[in-house]
Amino acid sequence: MVQYLAKRIGRSVLTLFIIVTLVFCLLRLMPVEGYFANYEKMSEAQIQAGLQAMGLLDPLPVQVGRFWKNALHGDLGVSHIYKVNAPVTQILAQKLPISVQMGVLAMLLSLVLGIPLGLVMGQYKGRWPDKLGTAFIVLIQAVPAAVYFLYIQMYGTAAVGVGLLFNAADWRYWVLPVCSMSLANLAFYAMWLRRYMVDESNKDYVRLARAKGVCGRDIALHHVFRNAMVPLVQYIPSAFLNTVVGSIYIESLYSIPGMGGLLVTCVQRHDNTMVQGIVLLYACVGIVGLILGDILMVLIDPRINFGRKEGGR
């Protein structure tokens, strides 16, 4: 396991380096006004002097090396447009907590509703609970998320009794965004748990338990469900982390001051330093989620041996 994790972390670091470096280079192709708050009022000489002071006229390899050197020391530069001269890390630290809180609530809701739904669908395969649950999953996956997000906002705002501007101090303002964010993962958990339970139900140990006269409910809960959860658990950390950093549309829709709205604003205003800092954070979050998923699988099912699997290839 340790050997596998070492290899996985090494590959992840390489992937992180490639992704962020590529984005860094692409941002250097963008117009230079993204580095100046008062670009329209500046002369060409002032622009060139500013670019020289920021090191943006240096050769690209030199810029990349300097960026990574500073990033390893926790310095991602300063914002030039969104909040002039404010450290990128400080802005991220202000915006990330509310996205994390909303992501945690959305994940808990999707697990609390999605896992029981998948369990019931798997236990009653082909019967009305399975058909009803399948119809719900198909609806969620077939309809574009933006469509049901808008419907939830239009009809839910009046029902819950909230305004259009988000108020973090009032719990009612959290209801609609959290419900909207949880729908996709809810359908995902239910669909795959149902599939894994159906697969497990056809295995020999289940037939043996039935032959011994074990109650069908006990088989489903104590054997089939536990084994079906093992592959699903792998995706929970990455799904949660992706929810935290991927709620761009939801946060923009409800005016939530989180990471999603920050990314949209910085892209629209061409704040390149902020964008590359956000991309670095997103890449780190995604990679950490994948590694945590593998670790969680081993903790739940000790029979899994990634080290032996890697050695056998």
Task: Give the role of each language-model region.
Residues 16-66, 156, 161-173:
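Hydrophobic alpha-helical transmembrane segments of membrane transport/permease proteins
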Residues 19, 106-114, 177-188, 260-298:
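Hydrophobic alpha-helical transmembrane segments of polytopic membrane proteins
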Residues 170-210:
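Membrane-cytosol interface at the C-terminal ends of specific transmembrane alpha-helices
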Residues 2-11, 117-153:
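Cytoplasmic-entry segments and transmembrane alpha-helices of multi-pass inner-membrane transporters
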Residues 9-12, 16-17, 21, 89-120, ...:
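Transmembrane alpha-helix signature in integral membrane proteins
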